[in-house]
């Protein structure tokens, strides 16, 4: 939680309207049906997300201060790929609220972080609904195009910067560091395309669709929440410049995208086998 100034009141109101509007759309467009299995899975996802939120792994990378790697978003993505939209909305709100209660923070909650949680479940859920097995070729093309665009933009951004500020200290981004990051991004993209080709011949149509949805969901969340919304919320709450943390976030995404895809797909496939 953070204490808000009067200048942030309007942002809070706008965020509240957006969250309520998403809830109205979800419950109107996709009416909830009473389902014990969905409720049970939803409760498990909330518990898992809260537990992972309190755990973090510090990873040193290219001589920069350790990157804080957390996995609490992954159960929310899996929830989005597993549950109905209404249950996804409830899971995200419950996770955010209980996380704040357990953190025992004072002040009024910042609704931007609540919106993050909502999007982390609803984006995968809507992707699952609108990009199903009938759009398999389209889904594969979207995955490849999005990954190429993100990789090119990441390389362009890294190429243009020469210095980054992390935790109040300045670090030079030398040519060897830039080259190493380019290689990592290229390797990640190549491995992903190899995996897609490998699984395309090995998996059944439904499992292949699940694999593609896992890729697209993880990438979409990294792009919208991690790379765009979270820096904007930090700028709004604490005055941290939007681009100040982008370099570190690109490094973090190099780790989280492949790890997230593997975990999300594995968890989702296991759950699908159990509930079938």
Indicate residue ranges for each PLM-predicted region.
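Loop-helix junctions at membrane interfaces
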Residues: 1-276
């Amino acid at each position: 939680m953070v204490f808000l100034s009067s200048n942030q009141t309007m942002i809070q109101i706008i965020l509240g309207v957006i969250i309520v509007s998403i809830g109205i759309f979800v419950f109107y467009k996709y009416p909830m049906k009473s389902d014990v299995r969905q409720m049970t899975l939803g409760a498990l996802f909330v518990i898992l997300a809260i537990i992972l939120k309190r755990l973090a792994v510090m990873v040193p990378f290219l001589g920069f201060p350790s990157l804080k790697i957390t996995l609490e978003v992954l159960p929310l993505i899996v929830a989005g790929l597993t549950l109905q939209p209404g249950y996804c909305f409830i899971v995200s709100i419950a996770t955010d609220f209980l996380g704040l209660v357990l953190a025992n923070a004072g002040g009024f909650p910042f609704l931007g972080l609540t919106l993050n949680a909502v999007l982390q479940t609803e984006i995968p859920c809507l992707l699952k609904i609108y990009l199903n097995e009938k759009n398999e070729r389209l889904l594969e093309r979207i995955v490849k195009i999005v990954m190429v665009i993100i990789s090119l933009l990441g390389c362009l951004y890294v190429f243009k910067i020469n210095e980054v500020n992390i935790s109040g200290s300045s670090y030079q981004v030398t040519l060897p560091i830039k080259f190493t990051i380019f290689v990592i991004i290229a390797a990640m993209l190549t491995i992903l395309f190899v995996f897609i080709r490998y699984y395309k011949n090995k998996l059944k149509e439904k499992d292949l669709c699940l694999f593609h949805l896992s890729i697209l969901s993880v990438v979409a969340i990294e792009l919208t929440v991690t790379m765009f919304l979270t820096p904007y919320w930090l700028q709004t709450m604490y005055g941290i410049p939007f681009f100040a943390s982008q370099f570190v976030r690109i490094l973090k995404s190099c780790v989280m995208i492949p790890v997230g895809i593997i975990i999300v797909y594995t968890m989702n496939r296991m759950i699908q086998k159990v509930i079938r």
